[in-house]
Curated annotation (Swiss-Prot):
Keywords: ATP synthesis, Cell inner membrane, Cell membrane, CF(0), Hydrogen ion transport, Ion transport, Membrane, Transmembrane, Transmembrane helix, Transport
Membrane topology: Single-pass membrane protein
Main location per the UniProt record: membrane
UniProt cross-references to NCBIfam families, sorted A to Z: ATP_synt_b (TIGR01144), PRK05759.1-2 (NF004411)
UniProt keyword annotation of Membrane present: yes
GO terms assigned for molecular function: proton-transporting ATP synthase activity, rotational mechanism; proton-transporting ATPase activity, rotational mechanism
Protein task: F(1)F(0) ATP synthase produces ATP from ADP in the presence of a proton or sodium gradient. F-type ATPases consist of two structural domains, F(1) containing the extramembraneous catalytic core and F(0) containing the membrane proton channel, linked together by a central stalk and a peripheral stalk. During catalysis, ATP synthesis in the catalytic domain of F(1) is coupled via a rotary mechanism of the central stalk subunits to proton translocation.
Source organism superkingdom: Bacteria
Assembly and interaction partners: F-type ATPases have 2 components, F(1) - the catalytic core - and F(0) - the membrane proton channel. F(1) has five subunits: alpha(3), beta(3), gamma(1), delta(1), epsilon(1). F(0) has three main subunits: a(1), b(2) and c(10-14). The alpha and beta chains form an alternating ring which encloses part of the gamma chain. F(1) is attached to F(0) by a central stalk formed by the gamma and epsilon chains, while a peripheral stalk is formed by the delta and b chains.
Name of the featured protein: ATP synthase subunit b
Gene3D superfamilies (UniProt xref): 6.10.250.1580
């Protein structure tokens, strides 16, 4: 009976030990485990939130980068259009200036031609008068007249 009584004594001691552990040891352990689980869950939630925030930030950065690229492309296009417009304006002005210079040169050449013609007319008239005077002052001689006309033609 000692074995049975020992077994019952051990069972009672074990029951007291379990009751003591349930009363004094178990609650702090459960609290520590719960706190640890809560911290881990909070950390995982924070990591998920940070991951979502990172994805949002990356999307926002991509949108801003795309907008900046579009704006830069638009500015470049505007600059190219303005450059083409300036080139076309310069070309038009150069063409107009060239036409004006050509017209002015033509007018100058026409004036010089008219002045030369007028001078030539005056010289021809003077030569004709000289020739007529010589013919009238000299005798009527066919060969002399022909020689004088050749001289007049050579002077022209």
């Amino acid at each position: 009976m000692n074995i049975n009584l020992t077994l019952i004594g051990q069972a009672i001691a074990f029951a007291i030990f379990v009751a003591f552990c349930m009363k004094f040891v178990w609650p702090p352990l459960i609290n520590a485990i719960s706190e640890r689980q809560r911290k881990i869950a909070d950390g995982l939630n924070a990591a998920e939130k940070a991951k979502a925030d990172l994805a949002d930030a990356q999307a926002q950065v991509k949108q801003e980068l795309d907008a900046a690229k579009a704006q830069a492309a638009q500015l470049i296009e505007q600059a190219n259009r303005r450059a083409a417009q300036l080139i076309e304006e310069a070309r038009t002005q150069a063409t107009a200036e060239g036409e004006r210079i050509r017209q002015q040169s033509k007018e100058t050449v026409d004036q010089e031609i008219n002045a030369a013609r007028e001078e030539l007319r005056q010289q021809v008239a003077a030569l004709a008068v000289d020739g007529a005077e010589k013919i009238l002052n000299q005798q009527v001689d066919q060969q002399a007249h022909a020689a004088m006309l050749e001289q007049l033609a050579a002077k022209l």
